[in-house]
């Protein structure tokens, strides 16, 4: 990795990318990114992808959405916190450590809050900027058979961000689909994010942020991305919940690594 890409320099770059991202109101307020990371750092991430055994299978909607006949989980994750990535080889660990620190930074979080103000104001009111947010970046890997049905995201979440990490532009059709809500309650496809290198999207989670993903076909080897979720961190219950989830996930991850050794 280039020495010049310090955490501070990379944070400044990502903040600038967020500030200059394209905004769209349809079907709900969201941002689109065309170059969230510097090109050379993006290639470092692509080349530093963990091995399949470094990931842990995800549950919940991502598991239930599996279209595989055997029901095998089709989404796996690696949390970008130091205690999770410490098992990676040093050359890969340094890349994901920097990425995680940048995405958890206050500067990046503040940039998202500023740019997503219309959506956050709709949900939280005039004082939206005072609502605490707890960032959790995870590296996700989807395999053929993955799909996720129309949903808005849990209101435990304040902001959803996804950065796509494909090595090339050969599978743009597997990006996330955004749905509009018609007066009769139907939710047809309105637009789709292209699954292209160094791109992505962000939105403030609300009752109208319907999105989905079609089944990933056999033409896709892996659908790699970073999911950056800002959990609402207001009040003692949410404060404890957010941090206890990190600790419990750490225990599950350590048990899995002990079984591997």
What is each of the regions a protein language model found here?
Residues 48-52, 177-181, 240-250:
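Short intrinsically disordered coil segments
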Residues 64-72, 139-140, 246-253:
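Amphipathic alpha-helical surface "interface" segments used
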Residues 17, 21, 44, 48, ...:
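Residues that form generic nucleotide/phosphate-binding pockets
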Residues 92-228, 232-240:
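Catalytic core of non-heme Fe(II) oxygenases with the double-stranded beta-helix
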Residues 1-26, 243-261:
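Fe(II)/2-oxoglutarate
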Residues 20-115:
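Non-heme Fe(II)/2-oxoglutarate
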Residues 76-83, 184-186, 207-211, 246-251:
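A general structural signal for short secondary-structure boundary/capping elements
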Residues 13-17, 83-84, 125-127:
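Short, flexible segments with low predicted structural confidence
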């Amino acid at each position: 990795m280039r020495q010049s890409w310090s955490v501070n320099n990379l944070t400044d770059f990502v903040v600038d990318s967020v500030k200059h991202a394209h905004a769209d109101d349809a079907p709900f307020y969201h941002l689109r990114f065309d170059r969230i990371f510097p090109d050379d750092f993006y290639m470092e991430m692509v080349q530093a992808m963990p091995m399949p055994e470094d990931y842990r299978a995800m549950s919940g909607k991502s598991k239930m959405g599996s279209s595989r006949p055997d029901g095998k989980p089709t989404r796996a994750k690696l949390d970008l916190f130091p205690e999770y990535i410490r098992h990676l080889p040093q050359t890969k660990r340094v890349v994901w450590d920097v990425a995680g620190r940048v995405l958890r930074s206050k500067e990046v979080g503040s940039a998202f809050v500023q740019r997503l103000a219309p959506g956050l104001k709709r949900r939280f009111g005039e004082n939206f900027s005072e609502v605490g947010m707890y960032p959790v970046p995870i590296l996700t890997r989807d395999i053929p058979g993955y799909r996720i049905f129309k949903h808005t995201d849990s209101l435990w979440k304040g902001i959803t961000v996804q950065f796509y990490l494909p090595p090339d532009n050969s599978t743009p059709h597997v990006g996330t689909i955004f749905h509009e809500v018609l007066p009769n309650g139907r939710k047809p496809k309105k637009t789709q994010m292209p699954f292209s290198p160094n791109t992505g999207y962000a939105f403030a989670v609300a009752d109208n942020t319907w999105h989905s993903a079609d089944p990933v076909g056999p033409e896709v080897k892996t659908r790699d991305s970073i999911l950056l979720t800002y959990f609402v961190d207001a009040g003692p219950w949410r404060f404890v919940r957010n941090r206890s989830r990190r600790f419990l996930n750490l225990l599950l991850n350590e048990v899995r690594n002990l079984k591997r050794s």
